[in-house]
Amino acid sequence: KYGVPPGIVTAIIGVETMYGRHKGNYRVLDALTTLAFDYPPRSTFFKQELREFILLVREENQPIMELQGSYAGAMGYGQFIPSSYRRYAIDFDGDGIRDIWDNPTDAIGSVANYFAEHGWQEGEAVVAKASLRNGSKQDSIGGPDSKFNVSLKPSSTVGAMRALGVTTLIEFDETLEVSPMKLVGKEGDEYWLGMR
């Protein structure tokens, strides 16, 4: 329905909660309240999430004192924060309830919907292995290496990276926004371009 491959959704749920085995055992209300009022560096963010949680509980008719999640208030199979739940959680099985805590069908649909709402394009590449053209001054100021690992969000374009000597086996539109990533491994560095 959303064009997101099952393997991607499965990977997210696997990484976040070991396929639902570790969804968190903290009361979400307690976690968010503590972080909102006792953690100054992120209090603005967590106050907003606490507000979103209270709205969620009211809208979904959920028991505020019983909902559990992570120490940071993330909930269910996909570890949605309250604002993400309100925007992206769906009732994928049609039973009238958006249950990401105990209903794997709703959780799967919600993760896929999250990707779709964030620009997932069915059939398009997610990443592409890249290489540096011989002669590229990778360590020079302004060279290709300075463009890698800048941000998880797109920070360059295929054309800009190509101009620095970065190539891919797959041809992409020059204007495609990418997030250049450099991974350090035993066998040497690997270069990748992450797409939106």
Regions found by a protein language model. Give the residues of each.
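Functionally critical loop-and-helix segments that line ligand-binding/catalytic clefts
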Residues: Q79
